[in-house]
């Protein structure tokens, strides 16, 4: 009842995590003409608490698209220029994932991937067996610690409790609260 505009998205309506988002009554905005579904956070840590933690590298395709398509302005850098920084960030925040060798999704410095469940593993094997055109099923690359710890930052391995949207008490997923804020105090 206090978030009528944000609840249109279906994202902020769960009791477990709606406290992360702005009260539309106390903090209104006018969207009558275009019905913009603006999800607005109201918490220390900003969007780093609610971003979903999907972490993909841009590829050479992304950096060269404007030049090849002849539209807009060409990027002044290429993937190879920032690849070392992707490595640094992935190691700092702890990105889990499966190296797949896909040029459109460059591999990185991943922690061990979350295990696929039985159905996902069966689908992965079936796709591999029945299609030889490069199709795959892979898990998402997300900023979750799946092995080891970052104890100085108060972060430990994911406990697989499916409570991510409530805010991880273990610091297993990356957020500014579990990492950057703590490190700034050290």
Model-derived segments and their meaning:
Residues 5-22, 27-37, 42-43, 52-57, ...:
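Conserved redox-cofactor binding core of oxidoreductases
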Residues 1:
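Glycine-rich FAD pyrophosphate-binding loop
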């Amino acid at each position: 009842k206090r978030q009528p505009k944000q609840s249109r998205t279906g994202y902020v309506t769960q009791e477990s995590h709606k406290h992360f988002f702005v009260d539309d009554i106390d903090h209104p905005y006018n969207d009558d003409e275009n019905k913009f579904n603006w999800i607005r956070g109201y918490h220390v840590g900003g969007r780093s608490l609610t971003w979903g933690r999907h972490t993909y590298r841009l590829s050479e395709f992304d950096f060269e698209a404007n030049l090849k398509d002849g539209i807009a302005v060409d990027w002044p850098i290429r993937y190879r220029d920032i690849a070392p920084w992707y490595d640094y960030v992935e190691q700092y925040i702890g990105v889990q994932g499966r190296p797949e060798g896909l040029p459109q999704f460059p591999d990185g410095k991943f922690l061990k991937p979350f295990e696929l469940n039985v159905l996902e593993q069966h689908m992965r094997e079936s796709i591999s067996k029945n299609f030889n055109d490069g199709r795959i099923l892979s898990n998402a690359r997300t900023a979750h610690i799946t092995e080891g710890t970052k104890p100085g930052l108060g972060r430990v391995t994911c406990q697989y409790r499916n409570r991510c949207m409530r805010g991880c008490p273990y610091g297993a997923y990356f957020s500014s609260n579990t990492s950057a804020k703590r490190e700034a105090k050290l």
